[in-house]
């Protein structure tokens, strides 16, 4: 698999890679000149979500000259998104050579991050990106760009107020935020909550869990486990249960055949 045109990256080290990226950004006059007229007490843009998509939105806006931006995420620092919370696959499913959130900067790609530590030979030998390693890369991305994510902050309500939006928040220094624009970068959580049948929610809580919950798989040792569904998260959790010593795992599927 061919590599990107990222010369002299191998074994460079993350500190030197950061300096290389900083030099590249300086050459592009980053960050862009602030052109937005300020309004007292108003944030220009609020981004809900400080994971991969939220961070690249921040980089895009900052590159374009917007400075008055707030990035909010309800997770604790370093645990944004699913990667080290409820995602349980061993590797990412996408090809390793996708550019991801690099926004056109070769030194900001996962490949550059990986090769700076392990070299080109290890990169060529790598099949899929390990899930936890991907989160390590995203943490480096945040730290390198100095993205001011406000962790532990939830947006509870959004209401119009004239030509602005007022956000009711919890976990912040103020109860509300007034903003011009709002970007939802909430990932899969943004499409709604888990769809759990009532007959399941009426069971004792120690007998069931949703795939997005924190699960102690060790308690499933020698147990018979039923998994409702056969999507990606269902397969991942079934594998996790078997690896933890479950005696049997059965998938309950409405379809006559496995979806392809």
Language model segments and positions:
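Glycine-rich active-site loop/strand segments that organize a redox cofactor
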Residues: 4-8, 72-135, 252-260
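Short hydrophobic core segments
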Residues: 46-48, 155, 175-190, 225-228
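Phosphate-coordination loops involved in phosphoryl transfer and adenosine-cofactor binding
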Residues: 42-44, 152, 221-223
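A conserved short coil-to-beta-strand element within the FAD-binding core of flavoproteins
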Residues: 151-165
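Glycine-rich dinucleotide-binding loop and its adjacent helix/turn
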Residues: 13-35, 130, 186-245, 249-251
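Helical element adjacent to the flavin cofactor pocket in flavoenzyme catalytic cores
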Residues: 131-149, 155, 185-190
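N-terminal Rossmann-like FAD-binding beta1-loop-alpha1 element of flavoenzymes
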Residues: 38-70, 226-244, 249
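Conserved Rossmann-like nucleotide-cofactor binding loop
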Residues: 53, 77, 189, 233, ...
